[in-house]
Amino acid sequence: MNPEKPLDVKVNFTNNHKFKNITYFPDSIRALLIGSSNSGKSTPLFKLLLVNDMLDYNNLIILSTSLNQKEYQLIIHGFKNKLTKSDILAFIQNEDKFKTDDGELLPINELCETFASATKPKGKITIIAVNKPEFIPHPDQLNSKKKNLCIFDDVLEQRQNIISYFTKGRHNSCQSIYISQSYMHVPKGTIRNNCNFLILFKLDPTDVNNIHEQIVKGDMTLLEFRQLCNLVWNEKYKYLVIDKYNEDLNWKYKDGLFKPLKEIDKRLFDNINMIQ
C-alpha cells in the first residue's frame, strides 16, 4: 500500500429509516409541548399521534403518570389489539356512541378487544407504556430498524436515559415529544437546547421572555413576539408552534399546526421579512 496515496473513504451517515412526517414538519421531531394544566395539551398531542401521515412511527413508547387517562387507554389497548390510528381516532371522536345508559364509557380494554375480534384489524404499531423513568429503555437499546416515537408526559424526575433521547435519539431512529407545564422547568443544557419543534399554549411572561431570548430574538423584537403570542392565545385552547430551524419564517411561526405567520399577522410578517 502506497502511504502517500490519499485514502478515498466514503462514510454513509444516511438514516435508512428516515421518517416521512407531514410537509412543513422537521424530518425528525424533538418536540416540546408546553402548557399549564387544563390548557388543552392533549389536543395537539393526540392529533400528532393519531391523524394519518402526521408523524411517521411504528413503535410508540409512553412514559406518563397519567396512563389511566382515557385517550392513553384507547391508544394503549388499541395498538395492543392491532387497531389502526384511524380506528382509535374514530373511538375518540365518537365517544358518546360507546357509553352505557348511565352515561359511563364502556371499559376501554373490552371495547378494543371486541372491535378487534369483530373486524380483524391490521394495525402494525407496537406500544410500550410505563409510569416510571427507570422502565424506559436507553435509546441505544431501541430497534433502529423501527420508527420509534417516545412521549415523556410531565416527568418530574429527570433521568439520564430520558435526556439521552434528545441528545442521541435521532441516531437511533427515534423521535421524541417532551410535555411540561413550564418552559423553564425543562432542562436547558440537554432537552431544551436539543428540541427543534415547540408547541406553546399560553405561558407566563417569564417563559415568553426566555423563549424570545433563546430562540426568537434573531427574527423579531420582544414586543413583536409578545404581540404574536397574544394574537394566537386570544382564544382558549389555541397554541403557537415554533419550528425552530425552519428557514422559511412564514412556516417557522404558526397558529396551531398549519396556519402560517402571514395568515396570523401579515404586517408582522412583512416587517420581519424586511429585516432579514
Predicted regions, residues:
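N-terminal pre-Walker A segment at the start of P-loop NTPase domains
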Residues: M1-K20, L67, F79
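Generic preference for hydrophobic/aromatic residues in regular secondary structure cores
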Residues: V11-F13, L89, I125-A129, Y239, ...
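P-loop NTPase motor core of the ASCE superfamily
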Residues: F19-G35, L55, K146, F197, ...
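An amphipathic, basic-hydrophobic helix/alpha-beta surface used to engage anionic
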Residues: L60
